[in-house]
Curated annotation (Swiss-Prot):
Name of the protein in question: Actin-binding protein
GO BP: any one term: regulation of actin filament polymerization
Domain of life: Eukaryota
Primary subcellular site in the record, as a coarse category: cytoplasm
Taxonomic lineage from the root: Eukaryota, Fungi, Dikarya, Ascomycota, Saccharomycotina
Location of region: 2 X 16 AA repeats of E(7)-A-P-A-P-S-L-P-S-R: 495-538
Acidic residues composition-biased segments: 437-453, 483-502, 516-530
């Protein structure tokens, strides 16, 4: 049997108004409310009143009704709310079957905020006295009623029974034994105070007050057993002692800053002592010499030490690591600066890096002596620097072009032309012309680039020795670079190289003069051997043939496509809807379960499940 839901929303406004009057007590004439269904089974307020007995007698025996009342229990001024659900046996069967569920709906949403809930099925369940006792028990403690009730029985009980029982035997004993009464009183009086004291001890009135223990300041101590084994090794203690010891092999415990400061202090003290000893020796040796001039080396050394002392007073002392870092930084700045300013920058850095040279410039007498020494040191590194400029064309890295000699300024300017920031990604002229020549010599049969031979003949002869005078060891790795270059690009690059290399005949001038003679017949032999199958004899150039073989296979590959086996309707915007036997092309396997494809008929692109289709290729 289906339950019949209750309809309390149609007249919910009227029910709410009457309910607020009962709960809030704004209207003294309305202390209870009963809602009952009408002919359309819509619940609405049927009756209201102010008497609790009238409330209990107003329920209809043929309907399922619900009532709420505000009652003040006896002995209390606080009103309590009682909710009554009336379900008589004479009500319709379907309504009675759904009474439990509907009563919960009424109690939670329609008439909430009650103190007591009562379910009544006949008049015996609506007994006024029983309901009032339930309400009074729910109201809590009633102190006024308890005080009034306790005072009456205590007075009546103390006046009736105990007086008769106590006084009759005591009077008889005292009258019968008047002489012996003097002996027992002290005996009886002594135990009385003792018993009182015992009672007080039992009541714990003399116990000290309990204090709360703060476990943070006064924590509990571990209870150790009294048994202590003798002769047993405590492994934990031994391990803790071993781990607490520092390993002398470790140096991490030493503070590097403190160690460096200590070494600086010791070296400073040592230098000061040496200076003082030298000054004392000079003073003591001057009268013994008898006016002769002291050795020049000692004077220079003393003057240098004085300059060092002045420099240290004016500037804070720097560690060797700091001096090396400054020197390295300045060298990097020199390599990045212009070539014309490199020479003065190097001399300037040498003056700044030397601790003694900065202040020697201020002393007129020492200037001429140290300039001679500085000139010797400056002239010595010139040959290796000049050798580096000679080998510039053979080096790929642009960093080696940064330190030219003074004699080769125009040559270095021409070499560094293509290495401006805009041309960093381009190849060097000397390198690029070699690679196409060797490629054409080796790959004439495969590539068939006979059209590039005329520009090779037009290359000026003095430039050729420079190209082949470069080391031939790095040629095999270079063969792999120009393979993807097209013919048109090679011709344009060769023309640019001819223009750049024409005004630079000075580079091959340092190479041996007889080198061009054996190279000319080599070119003729290469031209003659071009039609001959010379490639198989050289096994060093295998990459080009596999590239040619792979190229025709790429256009033959077809994009994956599939045929739908079932109809599928998209569940989201990024999915694809298709019918059975539809063709899906351009499939991308983004996942094992979901693929990305394009519908051939409409061109719509989206995701679809892989188990709905069958791949065609």
């Amino acid at each position: 049997m289906a339950l019949e839901p209750i309809d309390a929303t149609t007249h919910s406004r009227d029910i709410e108004q009457e309910y607020q009057k009962v709960v809030r007590g704004t209207d003294n004439d309305t202390t209870w409310l009963i809602i009952s269904p009408n002919t359309q089974k819509e619940y609405l307020p049927s009756s209201t009143g102010s008497s609790f007995s009238d409330f209990l007698q107003s329920f209809d025996e043929t309907k399922v009704e619900y009532g709420i009342a505000r009652v003040s229990p006896p002995g209390s001024d606080v009103g309590k709310i009682i909710l009554v659900g009336w379900c008589p046996d004479s009500a319709p069967m379907k309504t009675r079957a759904s009474f439990a569920a509907n009563f919960g709906t009424i109690a939670n949403s329609v008439l909430p905020g009650y103190h007591i809930q009562v379910t009544a099925r006949d008049e015996d369940d609506l007994d006024e006295e029983e309901l009032l006792t339930k309400i009074s028990n729910a109201a809590g403690a009633r102190y006024s009623i308890q005080a009034a009730g306790n005072s009456v029985p205590t007075s009546s009980a103390s006046g009736s029974a105990p007086v008769k029982k106590v006084f009759t035997p005591s009077l008889a004993k005292k009258e019968s034994e008047p002489k012996k009464s003097f002996v027992p009183p002290p005996v009886r009086e002594e135990p009385v105070p003792v018993n009182v004291v015992k009672d007080n001890d039992a009541d714990d009135w003399d116990e000290p007050e309990i204090k709360e223990r703060n476990f943070e300041t006064n924590p509990l101590s571990d209870n150790k057993p009294a048994y202590e084994p003798i002769g047993k090794i405590d492994l934990k203690k031994v391990i803790a002692e071993e781990t607490a010891k520092e390993d002398p092999r470790l140096i991490n415990r030493i503070d590097p800053s403190a160690d460096i400061a200590h070494l600086k202090q010791e070296s400073k003290i040592h230098r000061d002592n040496d200076l003082d000893n030298l000054l004392k020796q000079e003073k003591t040796s001057s009268p013994a010499v008898g006016g002769t001039k002291p050795p020049l080396v000692n004077l220079i050394f003393v003057e240098m030490i004085i300059v060092i002392r002045l420099y240290k007073v004016s500037r804070p002392e720097k560690s060797p690591a700091q001096l090396w870092a400054e020197k390295k930084m300045k060298q990097n700045q020199q390599s990045d600066s212009a070539q014309e300013e490199q020479k003065p920058v190097e001399t300037k850095t040498e003056i700044e890096i030397g601790v003694d040279n900065s202040d020697e410039m201020k002393i007129g007498d020492l200037k001429s002596r140290f300039e001679k020494l500085g000139a010797e040191t400056e002239t010595e590194p010139e040959p290796p620097v000049q050798w580096e400029t000679d080998s510039i064309p053979t080096v790929v890295k642009p960093q080696t072009f940064g330190q030219p000699a003074a004699n080769s300024k125009p040559a270095t300017q021409e070499v560094k032309k293509p290495f401006t920031p805009s041309n960093i990604g381009q190849r060097l002229p000397g390198m690029h012309t070699e690679t196409p020549e060797h490629e054409e010599e080796d790959n004439d049969d495969d590539w068939g680039e006979d059209e590039d031979e005329p520009p090779k003949r037009n290359i000026p002869p003095p430039v050729m020795p420079a190209r082949e005078s470069a080391p031939q060891q790095p040629l095999p790795p270079r063969n792999t670079e120009p393979e993807p270059v097209e013919e048109g690009e090679e011709e344009e690059e060769e023309e640019e190289e001819e223009e750049e290399e024409a005004p630079a005949p000075s580079l091959p001038s340092r190479n041996a003069a007889p080198e061009p003679e054996p190279e000319q017949p080599q070119e003729e032999e290469e031209e003659e051997e071009a039609p001959a199958p010379s490639l198989p004899s050289r096994g060093s150039v295998p990459p080009p043939p596999p590239q040619r073989a792979v190229e025709p296979e790429e256009p033959a590959a077809e994009a994956p496509w599939a045929t739908a086996e079932y109809d599928y309707e998209a569940g989201e915007d990024n999915e694809l809807t298709f019918a059975e036997n539809d063709k899906i092309i351009n499939i991308e396997f983004v996942d094992d379960d979901w693929w990305l494809g394009e519908l051939e008929t409409t061109g719509q692109k989206g995701l679809f499940p892989s188990n709905y289709v069958v791949l065609g290729n």
